[in-house]
Amino acid sequence: MKLSTLFTLATTISTLTTFTIASPVVVVEKRAINETALAEDIPTTKNNHAQASYGKPFAIYQPKAFIISMFSLERDPWLKAMDFVHNITIPGLSPVYPDIHCTTNYTICQITTGEGEINAASSISALTLNPLFDLTKTYFLVGGIAGGEPNYTTIGGVTFAKYAVQVGLEYQLAYEDYHKTNPDWISGYIPYGTDDQNTYPGNVYGTEVFEVNEKLRDRAVELASKVHLNNGTEGNAKFRKLYNETAAQGLPKVVKCDSLTSDNYFTGNVLNDYFANFTLLMTNGSATYCSTAQEDNATLEVMTRLAKHGLVDYDRIMIMRTISDFSRPPPSMSAYEYFFNRSDGGISASLENLVIAGTPIIHDIVQNWDKIYKSGEKYSSKNYVGDIFATLGGKPDFGKESFDTA
């Protein structure tokens, strides 16, 4: 197809698209990468290596902030708090959550991915690759509820992560299969490519550890620390007192600590102790495990891949988890009794605190867009950001010199 014909077709499609939108499209400044996407010569190759061009020359929406929820309970408080008047359906989203919600001028948008790693990766891929959305300067707030480690937080507490660690990528043996031969093992998990729980994995998939922008995380914490959190119910207060840890007994507050990702919903002292050690192992002692989630590493893997090609800015991602329950029982209960008969009831406070703690950074981004956030310079990362493979450049402050890739 001739380039002139392509431009004519594109103009026609753009015009038709405009007529199908219920409300006026906000005219916004286009990125240089998009302005030149179709003006480039078609590349030639002599080695059979065809490389696709990228950019979204016909993007309509350029949100400043995007809230990522995982399921309806995390989504609903945002829908009540924000003036989301537009519903945008795009291919590839969860069949349960097929719509993206945006404010009147499309400045703030929200997506619900569906729970678990596969749903998160699928939905975020669909969003970031969709031609209607230019996300090159968008800030992302992953906001969900999680289990909490009582050493560092309490029910209703708010956590902002620097690291996300995927703990499910390991070998696993049942207790009956290892306790006689390896009685000193904490659990039946063993890192890939090793036969020792205290040895760094010999081979990796690349999604085991992610690190996000510490300066932006700290800004979000600074703003969230100024608001009054929901402290929960009298029942929450009584349940907190069943724990010995100071953090668990206290009122909810905003803390800097890190997130674990596992599709397996785990609980109890045995697995918590092991995964706490595994977190230290995987991050060379840098991360502090305090929240259990099911999606963060999946979301960050998609963001890493797309950031490599300039479709998102990995420096503009924040991970916030509020605590709906403890990840281990109080001393007076067994793990079984706690998990199946618990009465901590912290989910209400955790859901309200998603909005209470997340709104300040969202508003700060929108209100100070031209002065601070558009360029991203003030809160650009000084720490390493990215995955264990250094996909985005730099040198990870975790991992080891080389791996076998699985």
Swiss-Prot record:
- What domain of life does the UniProt record list for this protein's source? Eukaryota
Q: Which residues form the signal peptide?
A: 1-22
**CC per GO annotation:** endoplasmic reticulum
Q: Which Pfam families match?
A: NUP
Asked whether the UniProt record includes Transport among its keywords, one would answer: yes
Arranged from A to Z, the UniProt key words for this protein are: Signal, Transport
**Activity regulation behaviour:** Mammalian nucleoside transport inhibitors dipyridamole and NBMPR inhibit adenosine transport by NUP.
Which family does the record claim for this protein? Belongs to the NUP family.
> What is the role of this chain?
Nucleoside permease that transports adenosine and guanosine. Does not show any transport activities towards cytidine, adenine, guanine, uridine, and uracil.
Q: Know the name of this protein?
A: Purine nucleoside permease
What species is given as this protein's source?
Candida albicans
State the gene name recorded for this protein: NUP
